[in-house]
């Protein structure tokens, strides 16, 4: 099952790759790390709730 970071990063990874086609996967992962750390607790809370919902499916 996907955790909250995975739920969020799925769409974000796609966007980053489309916006920066020459960016390597390691660079994308680093950008995702920075982006995740910049999310507010409220933003993360909804992602944790979505991850929990997906676990029950």
Swiss-Prot record:
A GO term for molecular function: DNA-binding transcription activator activity, RNA polymerase II-specific
Any single Pfam family the record assigns to this protein: HMG_box
GO biological process assignments: cell differentiation; sex differentiation
Residue spans binding DNA: 1-57
Keyword Transferase: no
Superkingdom as given in the UniProt entry: Eukaryota
UniProt cross-references to SMART domains, sorted A to Z: HMG
Positions of disulphide bridges: none
Location(s), subcellular: Nucleus speckle; Cytoplasm; Nucleus
A GO cellular component annotation in the UniProt record: cytoplasm
Record keywords: Activator, Calmodulin-binding, Cytoplasm, Differentiation, DNA-binding, Nucleus, Sexual differentiation, Transcription, Transcription regulation
Record's function text: Transcriptional regulator that controls a genetic switch in male development. It is necessary and sufficient for initiating male sex determination by directing the development of supporting cell precursors (pre-Sertoli cells) as Sertoli rather than granulosa cells. Involved in different aspects of gene regulation including promoter activation or repression. Binds to the DNA consensus sequence 5'-[AT]AACAA[AT]-3'. SRY HMG box recognizes DNA by partial intercalation in the minor groove and promotes DNA bending. Also involved in pre-mRNA splicing.
Family per similarity comment: Belongs to the SRY family.
Subunit comment: Interacts with CALM, EP300, HDAC3, KPNB1, ZNF208 isoform KRAB-O, PARP1, SLC9A3R2 and WT1. The interaction with EP300 modulates its DNA-binding activity. The interaction with KPNB1 is sensitive to dissociation by Ran in the GTP-bound form. Interaction with PARP1 impaired its DNA-binding activity.
Protein name as annotated: Sex-determining region Y protein
Gene that this sequence comes from: SRY
């Amino acid at each position: 099952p996907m955790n909250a970071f995975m739920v969020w990063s799925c769409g974000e990874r796609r966007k980053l790759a489309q916006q920066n086609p020459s960016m390597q996967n390691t660079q994308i992962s680093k950008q995702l790390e920075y982006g995740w750390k910049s999310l507010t607790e409220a933003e993360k809370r909804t992602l944790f709730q979505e991850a929990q919902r997906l676990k029950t499916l």
